[in-house]
Design a protein with these regions (language model features):
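N-terminal beta1-alpha1 cap of cysteine-dependent amidohydrolase-like domains
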Residues: 1-81, 217-279
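A glycine-centered loop/beta-turn motif at secondary-structure junctions
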Residues: 168, 177-245
């Protein structure tokens, strides 16, 4: 069993769930947005995924479950449980472990397709390197430049960002608009980008970010819920452009996501086996 925490309805597990199912695991879905409590560590199973959301990592007043999530993430890292934390999840993980998240990021928002700039550590990392290798191979097959395996296109959509990593963590990737894009703490892999997302989903997010920038709506959470009929044409066009850019790099996006699912499941099974032998 792998537990998936989905903070909001507009940032679903998407095709990452399909890829995890394809690896033969059972997913336990936890949805704070519908009233689910953050589970106790003993209920997690063999792995954890924490997804994104429009709320900030500091928004305990409106989302009191964030405090319980921080506590769970600390325990996950201490016990070396395989985990993936995405966007908001990565920001909450940084806060939980002693780092800092800026809301909003001093580097500004990021949306659409950006290039990950992989660190030297990424190629040797015990959790990340296999994922990178598979994504780079897919890029080469599709004729997408990687600068000798040091760059990868990914989908992003965020206003906030980690500005100081916790001690003892490994920086794995940056981007021009986000110095901390990917990092690891123990068996937890934290990703600012959205490997679960699709070109259609980034079209949805980008259009609403553009509408917010145009003053149509205030606040990221309100923008996420904006109906299509209320989007100005300029915002619709921004979303369409983002979708086209994502479709161009879809082979890499899929390869990264499938490899992420496979790596998480492999590590979760190893954790379960090790835990069983020590009982």
């Amino acid at each position: 069993v792998i537990t998936v925490i989905e903070p909001e309805a507009f940032a679903p597990v998407g095709r990452l769930g399909e890829w995890l199912f394809a690896e033969g695991v059972t997913l336990r879905m936890v949805r704070p947005w519908s009233g689910d409590a953050i589970p106790d560590f003993s209920e997690i199973g063999s792995g954890l995924v924490v997804l994104g959301g429009a709320m900030s990592a500091h928004d305990d007043a409106d989302h009191p479950w964030l405090a319980d999530l921080r506590g769970l993430l600390r325990r996950i890292v201490d016990e070396r449980v395989p985990a993936v934390a995405i966007c908001l999840g990565a920001q909450v993980a940084a806060e939980a472990l002693g780092g800092d998240t800026a809301c909003p990021s001093p580097h500004g928002p990021e949306g659409g397709v950006v290039e990950l700039e992989l660190t030297e550590a990424a190629g040797q990392d015990a959790v990340f390197s296999d994922i990178v290798d598979e994504a780079v191979r897919a890029a080469v097959r599709a004729g997408i430049p990687t600068r000798d395996g040091t760059r990868l296109p990914v989908i992003v959509s965020h206003d906030d960002g980690v500005v100081r990593l916790p001690e003892g963590t490994t920086l794995l990737a940056s981007s021009p608009g986000s110095p901390v894009q990917a990092w690891r703490a123990g068996k937890l892999l934290a990703l600012q980008h959205h490997p679960e997302s699709t070109p259609a989903r980034i079209e949805y997010w980008r259009a609403r970010s553009a509408a917010r920038a145009l003053g149509v709506v205030e606040g990221e959470e309100a923008a996420e819920a904006l109906p299509d009929a209320d989007l100005p044409q300029e915002a619709v066009a921004a979303g369409a452009r983002a979708r086209v850019e994502a479709e161009k790099v879809e082979p890499v996006l899929q390869a990264f996501g499938r490899a992420l699912a496979r790596t998480l499941v492999r590590n979760a099974r190893a954790y379960r086996t090790a835990a069983a032998t020590t009982r």
